[in-house]
Every structure is written in structure tokens, then in C-alpha cells.
From Swiss-Prot:
The species this protein was found in: Oryza sativa subsp. japonica
GO biological process, one term: signal transduction
InterPro entries xref list: PP2C, PP2C_BS, PPM-type-like_dom_sf, PPM-type_phosphatase-like_dom
Family the UniProt entry places it in: Belongs to the PP2C family.
Alphabetic keyword roster: Hydrolase, Magnesium, Manganese, Metal-binding, Protein phosphatase
List of residues binding Mn(2+) 1: 57-58
Compositional bias (Basic and acidic residues): 135-150
Taxonomic lineage of the native organism: Eukaryota, Viridiplantae, Streptophyta, Embryophyta, Tracheophyta
Protein name per UniProt: Probable protein phosphatase 2C 70
Coiled coil: none
Enzyme Commission code: 3.1.3.16
Listed Acidic residues bias regions: 353-362
Length: 362
């Protein structure tokens, strides 16, 4: 369900870049929706040997998705676990940190600036890529808390999915909360590296009910069709439960994959793509287009056009964002050069089973 334009906005925000180990392309499009609530981050050089890519699909407004695109990767860098090499813990804590940072006066002010109350963005400019200035990632951030009339702001009622991929040498870590998705192509076969967090999944349903929530027509408390998300603070108000056990939680599911020469690329995309095509269909589409098109951003644009519905209503009418990250032949050297920076691992099973992440190692 949603409010649609009389004609779709088909202008696209596109970009591409890379480093010694990979190259990427991305594109986003507002489509039939009246607003653009997707955001994304693409950083081939988060540090000298690490790349970071993320897609964020907002609901109830664009502020939370843009907040994540601006801040989540910086929190990964700042977390003490990151400096010790524990990428999984650093990204896990950074998801929860987003909820904390959006509270209080500073959170209210940032959300107001990024959302509808702040500067207006239209068309393709609403698809945000956060590009830190040289050295910005290394600067200690000022104390986040500040005093003001909104010091007791409990956080936003709007929210966002978050699906990020962190690549360090031959290790790929995917962290996901919500129904955006990351898919790996290995020898032409699609492997889901994330799981869509819908309320009717047994583990999600159990947590929702235990926290005092309910599910109606596949929606948490009759409103949200996601079981995990950043933001949505009205569904995280049980003071007797930790953050990971709230009705809706920002806790990401983590997946770690050791990359090999058989791995060709990953696709990160919001559900505007996955509602129209299966994981394997997207992988097949990308392979076919790459046979004749070298520009990955052009491939992304073609994928958006392929998914766009001819008329409003049904699949193909959502905002659409996609990032393709293509791996170069593995080498021992770290990813030291880059261009165009733009802004508990469970067992996996084959993609076609549709009951969880799939295992590229089987």
C-alpha cells in the first residue's frame, strides 16, 4: 500500500568507483512513490584494507534512512572492537547505536535537518551517498549529547531497514535488519547472505509476542510489516527488556563468508527490487547485462528500469536502490587505492529454499 504519483519519477542517481580489489556501481530511483525514502552508502575505502556498502529503506519518512547513511559506517569505525579486528561486533553495536543517537536534542535536530522539516531535496538528489572528507573518518567526534528543548525526545516513530556489506581482504561480513537484501553470485548461482525479517517468521513472532506486541495481517501491532528495523521507537518502549528483545529490534543478523575466486559479485538492494525479481533472477540479469555493458552503474540503471511498473499499483511501484559490487581477481595486496567514495554467523542454505540465508560454501 502507498500513495503514488500520476507518472513515475524516473530520474536516477548513479555512481561508480572501486579500488584494487573491487569495483562497484549503484543507482537509485524514486519511481511511483510521492517521496524518496531510500538512502545508500558506498565507500570502497573505509580504511586502507576495508570497504563498506549499505542500503537503507526508510518508512514513515526519509530521515532515519538518511541518518543511517550518514552515521552508521562512522560508528563502525569508532567502535573499539573495530580497531581490534572484530568487524562483526563493531557493526552489531553500530546498529544499536543508531537508535541511541537519534534520541534527545541532538537526535531530534539531526533528524529534522535530514527529514521533511529540513532542506528539501527532489528527484534523484534525494538518493543520498555520504562521502566523508579526507581524514574525516579519523577525527574524534564531539560529544553527541547536547541540551535543548528536545532533550527528552524518545526517538523517531519512523524507521528504516539496514543491509550492509563490509569487505576486508577475503572476508565478507553482511549485517541486516529488515527486508533489504544482500545476494552473492558464485559461479552464476545466487546465494542469499541475508534473511528478510518479516513478522510471521517463527523467531521474530516469538520475540514480538513475548515483548507484548501482536501481529495482524502480517504487520507488527497492525502497522509495521517488518520485525527488525532501526528507529520505530514506539515499538521499543518496554523498559524491562534489552534492545534485542523489544517488539521490534535493530539487532542485525550477521553472516560471514570467506571469498574465493568463484565469487563474482554481490548485489545489495532494497525491497523495491526483490518484490519484483527473485535473487537468482537478479543475478542472471546482472550476468547478462555485464556481457555487453562494462559500466556497473549502467547495469544498475537497467535493473531499475526493468523493475519499474508500467502503471501504479502492485509490484514495481516502490522506491528502488541497488548496489553491485564486483570482485576483482583475489590478490594478497590490501585495498590501498580508491576512487569515487560515495555515500553469530548462522548456517546458510541454498537460496531457492527461501527459509534463510544460503550457504555458498556447500
Amino acid at each position: 500500500m502507498g500513495v503514488y504519483l500520476s507518472t513515475p519519477k524516473t530520474e536516477k542517481y548513479s555512481g561508480e568507483g572501486g579500488n584494487d580489489r573491487l569495483r562497484y556501481g549503484l543507482a537509485s530511483m524514486q519511481g511511483w512513490r510521492t517521496t524518496m525514502e531510500d538512502a545508500h552508502t558506498a565507500l570502497p575505502r573505509l580504511d586502507e584494507c576495508t570497504s563498506f556498502f549499505g542500503v537503507y529503506d526508510g518508512h514513515g519518512g526519509k530521515a532515519v534512512s538518511k541518518f543511517c547513511a550518514k552515521h552508521l559506517h562512522l560508528q563502525v569505525l569508532k567502535n573499539e572492537a573495530y580497531s581490534s579486528g572484530d568487524l562483526a561486533t563493531s557493526v552489531l553495536k553500530s546498529f544499536f547505536r543508531m537508535d541511541e543517537m537519534m534520541k534527545g536534542q541532538r537526535g531530534w535536530r539531526e533528524l529534522a535537518e535530514l527529514g521533511d522539516k529540513g532542506q528539501k531535496f527532489t528527484g534523484m538528489l534525494e538518493g543520498i551517498i555520504w562521502s566523508p572528507k579526507p581524514g574525516e573518518s579519523d577525527k574524534p567526534e564531539d560529544t553527541w549529547t547536547e541540551e535543548g528543548p528536545h532533550s527528552h525526545f524518545p526517538g523517531p516513530t519512523s524507521g528504516s531497514t539496514a543491509c550492509v556489506a563490509i569487505i576486508r581482504n577475503d572476508e565478507l561480513i553482511v549485517a541486516n535488519a529488515g527486508d533489504s537484501r544482500c545476494v552473492l553470485s558464485r559461479k552464476g548461482r545466487a546465494y542469499d547472505l541475508s534473511k528478510d525479517h518479516k513478522p510471521d517468521l517463527d523467531a521474530e513472532k516469538e520475540r514480538i509476542l513475548n515483548a507484548g506486541g501482536f501481529i495482524v495481517a502480517g504487520r507488527v501491532n497492525g502497522s509495521l510489516n517488518l520485525a527488525r528495523a532501526i528507529g520505530d521507537m514506539e515499538l521499543k518502549q518496554n523498559e524491562f527488556l534489552p534492545a534485542e528483545r523489544q517488539i521490534v529490534t535493530a539487532e542485525p543478523e550477521l553472516n560471514t563468508v570467506k571469498l574465493s575466486e568463484d565469487d563474482e559479485f554481490i548485489v545489495l538492494a532494497c525491497d523495491g527490487i526483490w518484490d519484483c525479481m527473485s535473487s537468482q533472477e537478479v543475478v542472471d540479469f546482472v550476468h547478462k547485462e555485464m556481457n555487453t555493458e562494462d559500466s556497473l552503474s549502467a547495469v544498475c540503471e537497467k535493473l531499475l528500469d526493468h523493475c519499474l511498473a508500467p502503471v501504479s499499483g502492485g509490484d514495481g511501484c516502490d522506491n528502488m536502490t541497488v548496489i553491485i559490487v564486483k570482485f576483482k581477481k583475489p590478490s594478497k595486496s590490501a585495498a590501498t587505492s580508491s576512487t569515487n567514495q560515495s555515500v553469530s554467523s548462522e548456517e546458510m542454505r541454498p537460496n531457492e529454499l527461501d527459509d534463510g540465508p544460503s550457504d555458498p560454501n556447500k
